[in-house]
Amino acid sequence: MTVREPRATDEERVTAPVGEAGVEREELPLDVRVEFWLETFPWFPAFSAGFGAFLLGYVGLFATVVAAPLSLPEGDLPIRVGFLFYNAHNVVVTGVTTALPDSVPMTMDYLPLVGDPLLYRFLPAVVLTVASALFTFVRVPVRRSTTAAVATGAAMGTGYVLIALAGTFVFTLNVDNVLYQPSRAGTMLYVLGYGLLCGVCGSLSGQVAISVVHRT
């Protein structure tokens, strides 16, 4: 006769530390799992990781532009690199003449001016994915948890898009009575999409790394 060991109750599983071996949270009822992650997930550090990923991506792009000079327009290099960074997220930079506020906005795209546009498009995605993987490995050390990956992607994506929206007020340039700045609607759409997708994928990659480490 086979004797089964007693299984932990839902309450015992929920109170167990994140990542503890033998805790099968995916078997818990959905409402219990949601409550668990809302109460225990490190939301603020995840938001901060999203902030940091955006800043790191911008600094990395700025260093790349300085090391390998691109044919960007002269002057206001930090602002123009910021425009390029937003362009890499598929966000257009719009310009409205201050003399005619109701005129049709113009657009600015620096990607055609660089040698390899695809490389610059990949840069923010790679930085954000790696940041999410590292965050998962250090702060949310769980294995095979879709809930953890979604929570990480949502939190980091929110932090990422919030600082990107703030950046639309910082990265502005007035040229010949035309005020240029990244599109805020485009920032909400594309940057949030980048944050969610790369945040989830990075978290799943971090979980794979955790599984590999535990097997060795």
Where in the sequence are the language-model features?
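Generic alpha-helical secondary structure signal
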Residues: 8-14, 62, 90, 164, ...
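Hydrophobic core segments of alpha-helical transmembrane domains in multi-pass membrane transport
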Residues: 49-65, 128-134, 163-169, 198-202
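Long, glycine/tryptophan/cysteine-rich extracytoplasmic
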Residues: 50-122, 173-190
